[in-house]
């Protein structure tokens, strides 16, 4: 009988210890579970939709980090820093603005974490007035910083779709010189931009696609939708004879973890028709060895 009681007591202790170990393991698993990119993006989009409808510039600007950048094919250039971003939204929602009392719809095509604290996403947007008439629509490819269980815009690179006939011009505007920076990996990103121009003007789709990471994202005005991966980027890239691309690099930020964002302007001249198009770009790069690969390209045309 004593042996039975001793054995039962020992088994009970083992059972309790086992339960504790299982509980501890579950708690540890919960603690280290990676954040869900899709859920975070959906919540961010829902907040933006609600805050946009409220017309509260301060609240919308609060969705951006203090050092964020907006590249939105604005003729005046990129909008850099929290104060400038707040002012841009005050103008957006001001009386007399086309966007006053407007609403925004956001479509999400792709989202993923690229480091512990950096997330990217790409998709579509549509802005309508109170009568549901579309004011503006287009595509976006944004970079977000993750902190305290949520994400904020670090780089908004969103570009409206325009009719080519409305934005093609006979003017041949000059493109300003690129910046020079001593920040880490800047020269690699600078080389990537130069190679993009080189391969585009050579009409080499294969070489251009190799400038991207294997799972790179391309969101550009010249293509429908969001293009995913090198193979699709290559197969959807076409060139027209007589078109010459030029671009500059006007801003750069090293993000650590072999990631960097950069932005600038581009211009394309058609020598046959003597016309030009211009726009802006805001991209995310991943540095591997001596090369900066495009992890996400997001570029659009300026009206």
Residue ranges of each PLM-predicted region?
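Bacterial N-terminal signal peptides that target proteins for export
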Residues: 1-8
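Bacterial N-terminal signal peptides
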Residues: 8-15
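Short, low-complexity N-terminal intrinsically disordered segments enriched in polar/charged residues
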Residues: 19-62, 162-206, 210
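Short beta-strand edge/turn micro-motifs at domain boundaries
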Residues: 24-26, 135-170, 278-303
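A solvent-exposed, acidic/Ser-Thr-rich amphipathic alpha-helical stretch
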Residues: 35, 39-40, 44, 57-117, ...
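Hydrophobic/aromatic beta-strand elements that line small-molecule binding cavities or substrate pockets
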Residues: 85, 89, 106-111, 124-127, ...
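A short hydrophobic beta-strand element
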Residues: 116-125, 257-266
């Amino acid at each position: 009988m004593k042996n039975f009681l001793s054995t039962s007591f020992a088994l009970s202790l083992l059972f309790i210890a086992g339960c504790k170990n299982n509980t501890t393991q579950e708690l540890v698993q919960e603690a280290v579970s990676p954040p869900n990119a899709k859920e975070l993006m959906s919540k961010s989009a829902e907040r933006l939709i609600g805050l946009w409808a409220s017309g509260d510039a301060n609240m919308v600007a609060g969705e951006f980090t203090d050092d964020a950048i907006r590249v939105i094919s604005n003729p005046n250039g990129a909008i850099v820093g929290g104060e400038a971003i707040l002012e841009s939204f005050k103008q957006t929602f001001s009386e007399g603005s086309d966007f006053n009392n407007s609403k925004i719809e956001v479509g999400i095509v792709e989202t993923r974490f690229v480091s512990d604290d950096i997330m990217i996403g790409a998709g579509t947007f549509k802005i309508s007035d109170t009568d549901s008439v579309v004011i503006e629509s287009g595509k976006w490819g944004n970079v977000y910083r993750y902190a305290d269980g949520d994400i904020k815009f670090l780089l908004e690179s969103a570009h409206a779709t325009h009719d080519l006939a409305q934005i093609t011009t006979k003017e041949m505007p000059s493109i300003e010189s690129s910046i020079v920076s001593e920040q880490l990996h800047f020269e690699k990103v600078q080389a990537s931009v130069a190679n993009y121009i080189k391969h585009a003007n050579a009409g080499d789709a294969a070489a251009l696609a190799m400038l991207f990471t294997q799972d790179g994202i391309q969101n550009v005005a010249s293509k429908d939708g969001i293009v995913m991966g090198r193979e699709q980027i290559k197969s959807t890239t076409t060139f027209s004879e007589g078109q010459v691309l030029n671009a500059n690099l006007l801003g750069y930020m090293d993000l650590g973890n072999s990631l960097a964002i950069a932005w600038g302007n581009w211009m394309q001249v058609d020598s046959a028709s003597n016309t030009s198009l211009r726009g802006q770009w805001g991209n995310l790069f991943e540095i591997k060895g001596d090369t900066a690969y495009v992890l996400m390209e997001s570029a659009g045309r300026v009206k």
